[in-house]
Amino acid sequence: MNMAKDIKFSADARAAMVRGVDMLADTVKVTLGPKGRNVVLEKAFGSPLITNDGVTIAKEIELEDHFENMGAKLVSEVASKTNDIAGDGTTTATVLTQAIVHEGLKNVTAGANPIGIRRGIETATATAVEALKAIAQPVSGKEAIAQVAAVSSRSEKVGEYISEAMERVGNDGVITIEESRGMETELEVVEGMQFDRGYLSQYMVTDNEKMVADLENPFILITDKKVSNIQDILPLLEEVLKTNRPLLIIADDVDGEALPTLVLNKIRGTFNVVAVKAPGFGDRRKAMLEDIAILTGGTVITEDLGLELKDATMTALGQAAKITVDKDSTVIVEGSGSSEAIANRIALIKSQLETTTSDFDREKLQERLAKLAGGVAVIKVGAPTETALKEMKLRIEDALNATRAAVEEGIVAGGGTALITVIEKVAALELEGDDATGRNIVLRALEEPVRQIALNAGYEGSVVIDKLKNSPAGTGFNAATGEWVDMIKTGIIDPVKVTRSALQNAASVASLILTTEAVVANKPEPAAPAPAMPAGMDPGMMGGF
């Protein structure tokens, strides 16, 4: 059964949506800048969440009026999209959307053609984005990375953790954020490739106290077959034995007489050998074995390639500087694979990441990428209370995303300053009629983040903007101290990717709202009357269960 619909047209439709845009944007924009305030979100269970993270707040907002709610949801979409692309800048995106919608609406109401305005907005936005990229400064080196992370998280300590993590595992490495048991935030790094499979027999350990097997400069046999018959691998074992180096066997399983034979040789000291099961399942297992082979310079011995264990030679074995195996996991450090082959494999996984639609696949591909690229770092977040912990975790996630974005596309002066810097380029666009109106709307919107940051810190926005326009490039207003400073030197910076995504997403959704002519919403259903009680039934009886 289709629900009845409520429909609003042109000015009515836009006005209702703008009310929703305003409700959401006004709630989110109080968090912008160093003096941004917090917003408290009620949670159905547990303590309320206190946050200044734009996208978290935007996702919580649900309005009663269907038309207003649609406006709010569109802005929430801008915040989410910016968060997905750049991981930060959600509040800036919200402020820009609101500014473009308001300026645009004035002109549409006064009779301008929304399609012309939209064209102008798109042209101006593209010009602003090019200008931002042109003034970007690259970020490299531990100090620069620490500075970017410290600005985003408002904590120098967090900045140090993130730059340390990125230095240790590389820019493509996986950095995860977990909750710590204690009060302190700390960093743990697993270098090399780790997978969740331990030794098949505890008699294979080399250190009885720690119960781990350390293999220095080992050979690695990689196969998706079961090893049950020792005769299958005997020729290989004899060759490895001559080199006096240890061997790691990664196989579907090692059982039958093969396992006790290997263990016996290990105990006698003839031969240092450790066997582990292959990681993953199904197709993912094949891909992971291939990753290990590429990392170590070996070949996967598999029927898919028509290879048999008994025919394998030393050239099929991978090598590494060191391997550590405990009862649950194996870590391969410094595999001997060619850096070119590893780079090609990383590029292949990255292209699969771009095309996959499944979140689960994306997560698994990301893990494989990290393992090939250099390791996994875990930042364990500690805080005195649960509420503080949640808030801290969100801040660190933001900082990590902002830092990655900065390394990718460079940085510009923060605090909305860069958006004012590009005004000159946008103003120079020669456009006519409604297109020119669209450009002017963007020009006005580019001032809005600075205005809001100043307002939140208790300063007069227009005064700050006027002074900023007449200041040398790179000089900006530090809202935390009220001083005029060289923004980048002071460490007040924004990743270009964040600023650019915020502007592009805001312009895109705001122009959609301006070109809306009708809005269709579901009519609220009248509440169904409560069923009458059967005669003679005592209402008190209902509570007896």
Swiss-Prot record:
Pfam families in UniProt: Cpn60_TCP1
Gene3D superfamilies referenced in this protein's UniProt entry, alphabetically: GroEL, GroEL-like equatorial domain, TCP-1-like chaperonin intermediate domain
CDD domains named in the record: GroEL
Alphabetical GO biological process terms: protein refolding
A Gene Ontology molecular function term of the record: ATP-dependent protein folding chaperone
Gene: groEL
Summary of subunit composition and partner proteins: Forms a cylinder of 14 subunits composed of two heptameric rings stacked back-to-back. Interacts with the co-chaperonin GroES.
GO CC, alphabetical: cytoplasm
Family affiliation: Belongs to the chaperonin (HSP60) family.
Keyword set includes Electron transport: no
Coiled coil: none
EC number(s) reported in the record: 5.6.1.7
Binding residues annotated for ATP, in chain numbering: T31, L32, G33, P34, D88, G89, T90, T91, T92, G415, N478, A479, A480, D494
Organism annotation: Streptococcus pyogenes serotype M4 (strain MGAS10750)
Location of the protein in the cell: Cytoplasm
Function field: Together with its co-chaperonin GroES, plays an essential role in assisting protein folding. The GroEL-GroES system forms a nano-cage that allows encapsulation of the non-native substrate proteins and provides a physical environment optimized to promote and accelerate protein folding.
Matching SUPFAM superfamilies: GroEL apical domain-like, GroEL equatorial domain-like, GroEL-intermediate domain like
InterPro entries on file: Chaperonin_Cpn60_CS (IPR018370), Cpn60/GroEL (IPR001844), Cpn60/GroEL/TCP-1 (IPR002423), GroEL-like_apical_dom_sf (IPR027409), GROEL-like_equatorial_sf (IPR027413), TCP-1-like_intermed_sf (IPR027410)
Protein name, entry field: Chaperonin GroEL
